[in-house]
């Protein structure tokens, strides 16, 4: 045996040194039982060759190698015992095994001989393993009902029906589980033992089983672990919380919520302390307190949480203080308007005021008259009516009231038509007198007895006007020059 091995080694060394090379992709090949397995082999040389010989040998541990088949050039010479199991297509040195069985597991040796000027030899060895693929594993938990934190233990077992050379690995939340003070594994890692269980052991567990030809993972399973209560706290939907004190305005209803981390969920009870006595006022996670129904301004409460599986209990205390700020709020609640209503009212008032101001400015009588007169051409003023002895003096003065506004020089424009003057009074003086009367028109008429008597005399004087009416008017004006109120009434 050792002689043959030494001879093969010398042949391989000589072949490698002489230029013959035999190569295989891998020295270990894994096969699946019942399927075909192909062992690829590549060889090459640089010298002329007349004959090429390929030989396949099979050996198991502690046994002699067996001849499987061989070829010279393109002729195959199989072992009659294995002629239907092994196939080779020369000059290709690769070997096909079909079907593969557990008995085919071992070392396969390929040897290549080249006959030319001399004989060159080289060989390679391939280890073949045969396995059955694993099936999907199933995880079982004991006890199935769960375990109590710090009290109970738990065992997870991975069950696989098929597969050879199985390797087990436990995963928690997708990461490998390692040995710790509470975690331990069986001999082949097929079981995971947790003792004692804690809240930190809660998670998604799975079992991964693999072998050289396959791998399968179980469905995720979450063990049941009872724990808690932890982190008991009380919150409210309103009011001011400072530490364990809630400040509430009188007249407001406040809702308290008590919660804690626990499995299964806790049962809650609310306890009120009054006059050194305590009594349960409600069961459940929520408590509503109407502040106006509380007789005391400061009341102590307590929320208790109890886990009926773990048997653990926790409680938290808090104080509710009723303030009197709410009384003023209630008194002003019906009287005060909302900010939106106030803003809306102010906006409407400003809009209406601006509209009224715009209309008042737009339709003022004196401005309308002034705008209309300013738009009239200058020729219309020159066509104004003159005094006549047969017209009413009041109507004449009324007409001059609209047209008598001064120009840039401060002198009112008079009609172009000449007007006769009174006796001894030139026409230029008449123009100045009429302008002064128009320029000093009062804004409002004054009523008194003297003015009434003067009106009668003025009317009588004006009724007698004729071609010399203007002279009489000037005479009347001369008589009443010192009486300012009478001149106002004539106008």
UniProtKB/Swiss-Prot annotation:
SUPFAM superfamilies in the record: Immunoglobulin (SSF48726)
Subcellular location field: Golgi apparatus membrane; Cytoplasm, Cytoskeleton, Spindle; Cytoplasm, Cytoskeleton, Microtubule organizing center, Centrosome; Midbody
Disulfide bonds: 158-207, 258-303
Composition bias, Basic and acidic residues: 472-482
Record bears the keyword Ligase: no
Stored InterPro entries: HEPACAM_domain (IPR052280), Ig-like_dom (IPR007110), Ig-like_dom_sf (IPR036179), Ig-like_fold (IPR013783), Ig_sub (IPR003599), Ig_sub2 (IPR003598)
Protein name (database record): HEPACAM family member 2
Species this chain originates from: Bos taurus
Lineage of the species this protein comes from: Eukaryota, Metazoa, Chordata, Craniata, Vertebrata
């Amino acid at each position: 045996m050792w002689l043959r091995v030494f001879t093969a080694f010398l042949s391989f060394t000589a072949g490698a040194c002489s230029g013959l090379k035999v190569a295989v992709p891998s020295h270990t090949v894994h096969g699946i039982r019942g399927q075909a397995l192909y062992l690829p082999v590549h060889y090459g040389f640089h010298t002329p060759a007349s004959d090429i010989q390929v030989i396949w040998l099979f050996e198991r541990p502690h046994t002699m190698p067996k001849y499987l088949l061989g070829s010279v050039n393109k002729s195959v010479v199989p072992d009659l015992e294995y002629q239907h199991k092994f196939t080779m297509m020369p000059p290709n040195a690769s070997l096909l095994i079909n079907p593969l069985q557990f008995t085919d597991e071992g070392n396969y040796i390929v040897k290549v001989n080249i006959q030319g000027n001399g004989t060159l030899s080289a060989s390679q060895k391939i280890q073949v393993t045969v396995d059955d693929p694993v099936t999907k594993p199933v995880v079982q938990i004991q006890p199935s009902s769960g375990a109590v934190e710090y009290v109970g233990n738990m065992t997870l077992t991975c069950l696989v029906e098929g597969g050879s050379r199985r390797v087990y690995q436990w995963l928690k939340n997708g990461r490998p589980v390692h040995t710790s003070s509470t975690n331990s594994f069986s001999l082949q890692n097929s079981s995971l033992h947790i003792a004692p269980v804690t809240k930190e052991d809660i998670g998604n567990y799975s079992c991964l089983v693999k072998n050289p030809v396959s791998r399968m993972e179980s469905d995720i399973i979450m063990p049941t672990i009872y724990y808690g209560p932890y982190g008991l706290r009380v919150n409210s939907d309103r009011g001011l919380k400072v530490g364990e004190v809630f400040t509430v305005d009188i007249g407001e209803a406040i809702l308290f919520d008590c919660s804690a981390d626990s499995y299964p969920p806790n049962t809650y009870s609310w306890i009120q302390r009054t006059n050194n006595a305590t009594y349960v006022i409600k069961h459940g996670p929520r408590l509503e307190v109407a502040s106006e129904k509380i007789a005391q301004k400061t009341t102590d409460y307590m929320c208790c949480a109890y886990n009926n599986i773990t048997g653990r209990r926790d409680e938290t205390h808090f104080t509710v203080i009723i303030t009197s700020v709410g009384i003023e709020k209630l008194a002003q609640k019906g009287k005060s308007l909302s900010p939106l209503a106030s803003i809306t009212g102010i906006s409407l008032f400003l809009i209406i005021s601006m509209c009224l101001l715009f209309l008042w400015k737009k339709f003022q009588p004196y401005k309308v008259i002034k705008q209309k007169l300013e738009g009239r051409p200058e020729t219309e003023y020159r066509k104004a009516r003159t005094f006549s002895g047969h017209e009413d003096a009041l109507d004449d003065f009324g007409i001059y009231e609209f047209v008598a506004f001064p120009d840039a020089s401060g002198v009112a424009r008079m009609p172009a038509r000449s007007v006769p003057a009174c006796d001894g009074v030139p026409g230029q003086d008449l123009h100045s007198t009429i302008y002064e009367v128009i320029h000093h028109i009062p804004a409002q008429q004054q009523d008194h007895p003297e003015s009434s008597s003067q009106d009668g005399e003025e009317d009588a004087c004006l009724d007698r006007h004729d071609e010399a009416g203007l002279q009489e008017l000037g005479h009347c004006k001369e008589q009443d020059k010192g009486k300012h109120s009478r001149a106002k009434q004539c106008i």
